[in-house]
Amino acid sequence: MSDMITAAILGLVEGLTEFLPVSSTGHLIITGELLGFTGPKATTFEVAIQLGAILAVVVLYWDRFWGLLRPQPYVRFAGLRGIMLLLLTSLPASVLGLAAHSTIKAHLFTPSTVAIALAVGAIFMLLVERRTERPRYMTLDEMSPALALGIGCFQCLALWPGFSRSAATIMGGMLLGARRGLAAEYSFIAAVPIMFAATGYDLLKSWTLFTPADLPFFATGFVVSFLSAWAAVKLFIALVGRMTFRPFAWYRLAIAPLVYYFMAY
């Protein structure tokens, strides 16, 4: 299989799974093993193509991000208040991630821990879906500092590879009283600063693995990741108000043994 096809397949998997509550890590592990693309360079490539997925969310929510740079009298999720909410959400996982980065890389990327994270995240989703309380927060402009910080605390669960940042923040938001659609939308927006920081940090640490000859390979993965993430987020937001997350949970339980197998053997 050519390098460009490998890059395109991995970019497609990254884009489709990064913002869905299914764990992009688990899917990239399986896909990388099937394609025979593993090792330090593969890990760096997976980090790089995340930037394509991040850019897709920036494009989709450009008005919201632009609104953070200028106060708007009738929009509360804007200006300094909007920035403060995103900072509150990013803070817990940023602090914990920086403090425990080496430990996470060394001890939480084992076959058993990633597979268990997939299963635990699935059970968490099923439990949250059993709740029947009416949501208290309906739109981004109703977001409170307490809700933003609470979602940020749940985001720390995503430091466990395989748990899924989207699952942690969407389910955490719903548990704290956010409407299903709001929890998903805020999860995508709040992903940008922390994912950009984490991706940039990882790339800075591994930039020596890049060579000029790798540029077409990385560019292909980046572009495919951007396009597939754009489509996945658009479709997910269109459907999220009419569906539960139970199918995603059962799917995670089904692939957890596969992730363990491909990582262990």
From Swiss-Prot:
The gene is uppP. Belongs to the UppP family. It is an enzyme of class 3 (hydrolase). This is Undecaprenyl-diphosphatase. It is a multi-pass membrane protein. Keywords: Antibiotic resistance, Cell inner membrane, Cell membrane, Cell shape, Cell wall biogenesis/degradation, Hydrolase, Membrane, Peptidoglycan synthesis, Transmembrane, Transmembrane helix. The keyword Transmembrane helix applies. The lineage of its organism: Bacteria, Pseudomonadati, Thermodesulfobacteriota, Desulfovibrionia, Desulfovibrionales. The keyword Transmembrane helix applies.
